[in-house]
Design a protein with these regions (language model features):
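Extended amphipathic alpha-helical scaffold segments
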Residues: 22-30, 63-76, 101
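Long, amphipathic alpha-helical coiled-coil segments characteristic
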Residues: 3-48
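Short, well-ordered alpha-helical segments
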Residues: 41-45, 58-74, 88-96
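Generic structural signal for well-ordered, non-transmembrane alpha-helical segments
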Residues: 17-20, 24, 43, 50, ...
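Secondary-structure edge/capping motif, primarily at the C-terminal ends of alpha-helices
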Residues: 26-37, 56-59, 75-85, 107, ...
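Structural secondary-structure packing elements that flank or coincide with functional cores
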Residues: 1-9, 82-129
């Protein structure tokens, strides 16, 4: 491991359960939006993603926070009806939330911190925006 990929898991260990819960709630809010087309659910989803963003920033995963920022921006645009909120956007959001969860699980399992692995997901978000 080199200095660029070395990451102290200690702080992440403390907040990982809360991050997982926030990601789960974000998924639930997104599903509720799909079922009801109630834009309030997009706000709930964005709120949970914002919680994840804050936790990631606190533990020093700045590269990953770029993904949560882009996710929040897409959700805000959908909520305010500035961006399309159809199936394609919802699919990208589902993929993003899943990729975040998997990336963090991989970190906890000992994988190095390589946020560039999330670049394809980030690009999908940017395309949706």
């Amino acid at each position: 491991m080199n200095a660029a990929t070395e990451f102290d898991l200690g702080p992440l260990t403390w907040v990982k359960g809360e991050i997982d819960l926030a990601l789960q709630r974000a998924e639930q809010a997104l599903e509720a939006y799909v079922d009801s087309a109630d834009r309030t659910q997009l706000k709930f989803c964005r709120t949970h993603v914002h919680q994840v963003h804050g936790a990631l920033a606190m533990v020093g995963l700045e590269g990953v926070t770029l993904l949560t920022e882009a996710t929040e921006a897409l959700l805000a645009g959908m909520e305010e009806d500035r961006l399309p909120s159809g199936d394609a956007a919802v699919t990208v959001l589902h993929q993003t939330l899943g990729a975040l969860r998997q990336y963090l699980d991989d970190l906890m399992a000992g994988e190095p911190n390589r946020p560039l692995l999330l670049l394809p997901v980030y690009q999908s978000l940017e395309t949706a925006r």
